[in-house]
Swiss-Prot record:
Cited Gene3D superfamilies: Glycogen synthesis protein GlgS
Name of the gene encoding the protein in the UniProt record: glgS
The species this protein was found in: Shigella flexneri
HAMAP family in UniProt: GlgS
Family the entry assigns: Belongs to the GlgS family.
Function statement: Major determinant of cell surface composition. Negatively regulates motility, adhesion and synthesis of biofilm exopolysaccharides.
One Pfam family from the record: GlgS
Taxonomy, superkingdom: Bacteria
Protein name as annotated: Surface composition regulator
Length: 66
């Protein structure tokens, strides 16, 4: 169980990092990133990546408003 939790923490860190890169305008090939993941991890990773992208875009919009 602990190994699985560590894996999810690592995947979450990677999803956040790639979302930050995307928000900075750097190219991110999400298919290449997730290419070797099994379906369960790929689905989870892509959902987290999309969530972080959304959060970062909302934060950027708030910065531009002020």
């Amino acid at each position: 169980m602990e190994h699985s939790l560590n894996s999810l923490n690592n995947f979450d860190f990677l999803a956040r990092s790639f979302a930050r890169m995307h928000a900075e305008g750097r190219p991110v090939d999400i298919l290449a990133v997730t290419g070797n993941m099994d379906e369960e991890h790929r689905t989870w990773f892509c959902a987290r990546y999309a969530w972080y992208c959304q959060q970062m875009m909302q934060a950027r919009e708030l910065e531009l408003e002020h």
